């Protein structure tokens, strides 16, 4: 089961690398939908079946509508693929190579990454001793997001705040 989750998480990141180097809206939307589905699979394999189902229905359902309209508006007769442009293909391959090196480096025994120390998280237990569950994994994951994952939550909020200004700047009409 752990290998399946690992493969899904690697494909999850590969999908987002494909989205970030998208040459056409068709392939970018496809990459985002595949990555969203894999993320829901990771959540469901971790024990959060209800959360995975809700994210799958709401997030991917909304994305299908948005990307359906986007693709209909930006239909190209000959859409550009990842291999048709050398720069886009090289950006995709460099991102993929960086991910492979990161995974190899993390599994090599070196546990420190850019100031974040991953050791000591062995004591972070979501289940009780002997298989007796104190709290469901859905609830303990939400609690750990606000306690141990505070910096991740703050960074995600900051990125959403900055994305408002980016979207406003892109869509602003210049006369």
Curated annotation (Swiss-Prot):
Coiled coil: none
GO biological process: mitochondrial electron transport, NADH to ubiquinone; mitochondrial respiratory chain complex I assembly
Gene Ontology CC entries for this record: mitochondrial inner membrane
InterPro entries the UniProt entry points to: ComplexI_Subunit6, NADH_UbQ/plastoQ_OxRdtase_su6, Nuo/plastoQ_OxRdtase_6_NuoJ
Keywords tagged on the record: Electron transport, Membrane, Mitochondrion, Mitochondrion inner membrane, NAD, Respiratory chain, Translocase, Transmembrane, Transmembrane helix, Transport, Ubiquinone
Principal place of residence: mitochondrion
GO molecular function: NADH dehydrogenase (ubiquinone) activity
Pfam family, one: Oxidored_q3
Keyword Transmembrane helix: yes
Gene3D superfamilies per UniProt: NADH-ubiquinone/plastoquinone oxidoreductase chain 6, subunit NuoJ
EC number: 7.1.1.2
Subcellular location: Mitochondrion inner membrane
Stretches that traverse the bilayer: 1-21, 24-44, 51-71, 87-107, 112-132, 148-168
Catalytic reactions of this protein: a ubiquinone + NADH + 5 H(+)(in) = a ubiquinol + NAD(+) + 4 H(+)(out)
Membrane topology qualifier: Multi-pass membrane protein
Cited function: Core subunit of the mitochondrial membrane respiratory chain NADH dehydrogenase (Complex I) which catalyzes electron transfer from NADH through the respiratory chain, using ubiquinone as an electron acceptor. Essential for the catalytic activity and assembly of complex I.
Subunit description: Core subunit of respiratory chain NADH dehydrogenase (Complex I) which is composed of 45 different subunits.
PANTHER family associated with the record: NADH UBIQUINONE OXIDOREDUCTASE SUBUNIT ND6, NADH-UBIQUINONE OXIDOREDUCTASE CHAIN 6
Family: Belongs to the complex I subunit 6 family.
Protein name stated in the entry: NADH-ubiquinone oxidoreductase chain 6
Species whose genome carries this gene: Elephas maximus
């Amino acid at each position: 089961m752990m290998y399946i989750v690992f493969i899904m998480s690697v494909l999850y990141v590969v999908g987002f690398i494909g989205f970030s180097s998208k040459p056409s809206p068709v392939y970018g939307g496809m990459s985002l939908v595949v990555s969203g589905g894999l993320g829901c699979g990771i959540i469901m394999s971790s024990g959060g079946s209800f959360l995975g189902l809700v994210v799958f229905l709401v997030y991917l359902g909304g994305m299908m509508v948005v990307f359906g309209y986007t693709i209909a508006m930006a239909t190209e007769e000959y859409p550009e693929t990842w291999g048709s442009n050398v720069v886009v293909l090289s950006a995709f391959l460099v991102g993929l190579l960086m991910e492979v090196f990161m995974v190899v480096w993390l599994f090599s025994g070196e546990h420190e990454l850019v100031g974040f120390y991953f050791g000591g998280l062995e004591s972070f237990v979501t289940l009780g001793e002997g298989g007796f569950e104190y709290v469901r994994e859905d609830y303990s994951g939400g609690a750990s997001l606000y306690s141990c994952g505070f910096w991740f939550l703050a960074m995600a909020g900051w990125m959403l705040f900055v994305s408002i200004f980016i979207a406003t700047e892109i869509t602003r009409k210049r006369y």
